[in-house]
Design a protein with these regions (language model features):
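Cell-envelope/extracellular polymer assembly enzymes that use nucleotide-activated donors
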Residues: 6-8
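Short, well-formed alpha-helical segments that are part of the catalytic scaffolds
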Residues: 10-29
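Acidic helix N-cap motif at the loop->helix transition within catalytic regions
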Residues: 18-22, 42-51, 94-95
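A conserved acidic beta->alpha catalytic loop
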Residues: 26, 37-47, 60, 86
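Short, structured coil segments at secondary-structure junctions
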Residues: 29, 50-52, 164
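Short, acidic/glycine-rich phosphate-metal binding loop used to engage nucleotide
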Residues: 57-64
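Catalytic-site signature of metal-activated, phosphate-bearing donor transferases
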Residues: 65-66, 72, 92-273
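Active-site nucleotide-sugar/metal-binding loop of Leloir-type enzymes
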Residues: 69-81
Length: 276
């Protein structure tokens, strides 16, 4: 049993009562947990109080910084390391053990982490595993700034990734991403994301910046009808999504639909611009 892991966990939330309790329960060994709330109207604040963790309310003014960067700039952390975690992301014992070991002796200033997705009630071992950079040293950087106009209603960094100065490592033990809110919520959420992505691409087509290799490939193809089918083949065939049965097929199909929506919305934006 590992106790007092010297990492500050930050959980940005809004109305996450269904998953927040389980998420916090699994973080017992962490030295500090801070929940940053966008004025939830459900029982989320009471759940944070029950677990005796720090509660911070965030009110977005529509400008930079958004929630994660605002927290990095305005909330004092007890520890050298910060881990950003969503309320539907659950740490495992293996992850906690590996985390405690790697941060105790490393020259890295951040770590990539793999995520296993649960989709339609099934924990997906194949397909296209999610990978993020949510763990880094405080002061080593922050989430990228992406200029936005009125088309963005997101108060938190969703598409933005941390820009860090230093070596980046890898933690092999995954975090479990378990979304309990069903397909309707999944489709609505990705509809919002595709709108954001289309507008952002049209506003600023030079995405070379400090992108990962995968992101550079994505933005070279995103203005093409081919990206959706290519991504389906990548998820379902090359990454073994077919081994997951109907859930693997649906997962890959929804990913294909997402990129179709981005391209279709790009065409709509251009049509509207031509008529102005």
């Amino acid at each position: 049993m590992i106790n007092n892991i010297p990492v500050t966990v930050v959980i940005p939330i809004k109305n996450e009562e269904k998953t927040l309790g389980k998420c916090l329960e699994l973080l017992e060994e962490f030295d500090e947990v801070i929940v940053v709330d966008s004025s939830s109207t459900d029982k989320s604040p009471e759940i944070v109080k029950h677990f005796n963790r720090t509660y911070v309310n965030f009110v977005w003014n529509g400008l930079f910084p958004k929630k994660r960067n605002w927290t990095l700039r305005n909330v004092k952390f007890k520890n050298e390391w910060v881990l950003f975690l969503d309320a539907d992301e659950f740490v495992t014992d293996k992850f906690k053990q590996e985390l405690a070991v790697v941060i105790s002796n490393t020259n890295c200033i951040g770590f990539w982490i793999n995520y296993q997705n649960e989709f339609m009630g099934k924990l997906m071992k194949h397909g296209a595993p999610m990978k993020k950079l949510p763990l880094f040293k405080v002061g080593s950087g922050e989430y990228e700034y992406i200029p936005e106009k009125s088309w963005s209603k997101l108060d938190m960094e969703i598409h933005e990734h941390p820009v860090l100065k230093g070596d980046i490592g890898q933690i092999n033990s995954p975090i479990i991403h378990r979304d309990f809110r069903g397909l309707t919520h999944y489709i609505q959420k990705h509809n919002e994301y595709s709108s954001w992505e289309a507008h952002h691409y049209q506003e600023k087509k030079d995405h070379s910046g400090e992108l990962t290799y995968q992101q550079r490939i994505k933005y070279k193809l995103i203005d093409s009808w081919a990206l959706g089918p290519l991504y389906f083949c990548y998820c379902y065939i090359f990454r073994g999504g077919f081994l997951e049965g109907k859930e693997g097929f649906m997962w890959a199909a929804y990913k294909m639909q997402y990129f179709f929506n981005v391209k279709a919305k790009l065409e709509e934006i251009r049509m509207q611009d031509d008529h102005e």
